[in-house]
Amino acid sequence: QECIRAKSPITAENAINIGITGGGVIDGSGDLWRPVKQFKLTDRQWEALMKKSQYTIDTKEGGIWMPTESSFKGNEHNIQLDAENALEKASEYYDFYRPVMVSLRHCKRILLDGVTFMNSPAWNIHPFFCKNLTVRNVTVSNPYYAQNGDGIDVESCKKVHIHNCTFETGDDAICLKSGKNAVARQIEGPCEDVYIHDCLVNKGHGGFVIGSEMSRGIKNVLVENCTFLGTDVGVRMK
């Protein structure tokens, strides 16, 4: 389901034969974007955040720190894509609409190899309706308190091979999705033919997760020889 987001710093759409490879580090400066829940931090960590920004939201779980005035007001207004003049209205609250760090949409023959992806504003890697995707020898790292800090969210993709990767995230590590609600079901596109093996998840909500957005279906998936050490749940079906 389409939604309002800031432009991803790394984006490809309708591209063929693309790769992000090598031993480098891609840092998304997520601390400048992400809200932080107070209960996930020590008192000293919370005090340090409050010196950077005084904007907070009160909830039953405690406070949520917002990094900027724009993100704080964006949360209040929460403009959705189906609103009249939505993009124009949302631009005033740009910081609220956190981007995924790597967005790959309708691409074919993709290789991610050897790179470290870290500190993303929202999800780290989001392949969407892609075909022939290989992710190997990749490290994905986010702080344990990173809100929506998923490792990789493979959505409605075909022929996916993820192996020998290491994840440490603030949310789900390896996640398969296929769209949300009736809007998603208008377009055929299950997530299918996925092979995941020899991956290590040091920390995260779920090590390997299906859902929660799965309206177009998920099929033909094999996960083996993976190690989940510090996850809340190893394998999770939402």
Where do the language-model regions lie?
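Extracellular/periplasmic carbohydrate-active domains that bind, remodel
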Residues: Q1-K238
